[in-house]
Swiss-Prot record:
MF (Gene Ontology): glycine hydroxymethyltransferase activity; pyridoxal phosphate binding
Coiled coil: none
Documented EC number(s): 2.1.2.1
Main location class: cytoplasm
Post-translational modification N6-(pyridoxal phosphate)lysine, affected residues: 226
Biological processes per GO annotation: glycine biosynthetic process from serine; tetrahydrofolate interconversion
Name listed for the protein in its UniProt record: Serine hydroxymethyltransferase
Reactions it catalyzes: (6R)-5,10-methylene-5,6,7,8-tetrahydrofolate + glycine + H2O = (6S)-5,6,7,8-tetrahydrofolate + L-serine
Gene name as annotated: glyA
Species annotation: Helicobacter pylori (strain J99 / ATCC 700824)
């Protein structure tokens, strides 16, 4: 197959080939990463990248939008059907952009946000001091108890003391299910709006493998990749017409200009895939595979935050180990297992070193790996961590896992 890119920019082409090889031969276990559908990539690489379309369907500032109006309208309708809600904005460029747009729509400068503490699994956009949300608004945080689960009673006490305008329930590194109903009770008790950030678990939500944020949340944000397996992008959902109008204005012209029509088309394609029965089977596999991995690691006496997992990710706890999350990240990477270092509750090391790693099952499940493979992977992770400085062992495991990975190709035909 001939590629224009190979002829016009051989350097970038070779880097893409190199990355294609890495994705095929390594075991991708970063919880926020996944392998998207070939049809999604085709839509993203289409001529739609040429079209500017500021505004919304049938309310554009540019001409020639009659076709992209159909595309965005279809993406909106599919999103509403998928999440069983009345309003959807599909223009957000990312999950962070989606969250920032929600704040821009519903808060005033220096209003109060209550979100999950970063070291307990929250996201930068939930009020971290280093992010815009921590600078433009007064941010406060709730966390987890000694058992690693969200402490809802403590969250209520903090909310009663702080009286935030918005409470964010969601995470980037929390291995348990969110109780949206309890968070709504907390929000109602203090007169706050409730934002459900389901970026990580959206794929599980639509497959009924995780609690649904509606009707409890006033507004819901998500990414369209991660467990949804769509293109990289953001999404905002609500059942409130007034909030929906504010969200639309906050996205355009509030925080963004022209939407990425090739990505919006890809979102529509992804949503259609998510609506298929096969996707429900995939989401079920994601959860069951993670259960196998957690069980295997626990049987090998490895400590997990909260003692296990209820979703697509787990966190390994190295607080009492001589090695750090960074050490484990590097060692496992040398063995062909890609994870990420992560802060954990009770963190004692700095964020560039950390005392934990985050591991996800979504990408390998997309390749078709099941319980047998995840048990093997769990045992190999244990072997590496128990002899973390053994480079020869890491290289040996890498070759073993490469053989296994090649039995589950990412894509069955050349596609970049």
């Amino acid at each position: 197959m001939a590629y224009f890119l190979e002829q016009t920019d051989s350097e970038i082409f070779e880097f893409i080939v190199e990355e294609f090889k890495r994705q095929n031969e390594h075991l991708e276990m970063i919880a926020s990463e996944n392998y998207t559908f070939p049809s999604v990539m085709e839509a993203m690489g289409s001529i739609l990248t040429n079209k500017y379309a500021e505004g919304y369907p049938n309310k554009r500032y540019y001409g020639g939008c009659e076709v992209v109006d159909k595309i965005e309208s279809l993406a909106i309708e599919r999103a509403k059907k998928l999440f069983n809600c009345q309003f959807a904005n599909v223009q957000a460029h990312s999950g962070s952009q989606a969250n920032n747009a929600v704040y821009h729509a519903l808060l005033k400068l220096y209003d109060k946000i209550l979100g999950m503490d970063l070291s307990c699994g929250g996201h930068l956009t939930h009020g971290a001091k280093v992010s815009l949300t921590g600078k433009h608004y007064q941010s406060f945080s709730y966390g987890v108890g000694l058992d690693g689960y969200i402490d809802y009673e403590e969250a209520l006490k903090i909310a009663q003391s702080v009286k935030p305008q918005i409470i964010v329930c969601g995470f980037s590194a929390y291995p348990r299910e969110i109780d949206f109903k309890k968070f709504r009770e907390i929000a109602d008790a203090v007169g706050a709006l409730l934002l459900g950030d389901i970026a990580h678990v959206a794929g599980l939500v639509v497959a009924n493998e995780h609690a649904h944020p509606f009707p409890h949340c006033h507004v819901v944000s998500s990414t369209t990749h991660k467990t949804l397996r769509g293109p990289r992008g953001g999404l905002i959902l609500t059942n409130d017409e007034e909030i929906a109008a504010k969200i639309d204005k906050a996205i355009f012209p509030g925080t963004q200009g022209g939407p990425l029509m090739h990505v919006i088309a890809a979102k529509a394609v992804g949503f259609k895939e998510n609506l298929k029965p096969e996707f429900k089977a995939y989401a079920k596999l994601v959860k069951s595979n993670m259960q196998v991995l957690a069980k295997t690691l626990k049987e090998k006496n490895h400590k997990l935050v909260s003692g296990g997992t209820s979703n697509h990710l787990l966190l390994m706890d190295f607080l009492d180990k001589p090695y750090s999350g960074k050490d484990a990240d590097i060692a496992l990477g040398n063995a062909g297992i890609t994870v990420n270092k992560n802060t954990i509750p009770g963190e004692t090391r700095n964020p560039f070193v950390t005392s934990g790693i985050r591991i996800g099952s979504a990408a390998l499940s997309a390749r078709g790996m099941g319980a047998k493979e995840f048990e093997i992977i769990g045992n190999k992770i244990s072997d590496i961590l128990n002899d973390i400085n053994n480079v020869s062992l890491q290289l040996h495991v890498k070759e073993e896992l490469k053989t296994m990975a090649n039995q589950f190709p990412v894509y069955h035909q050349p596609i970049f």
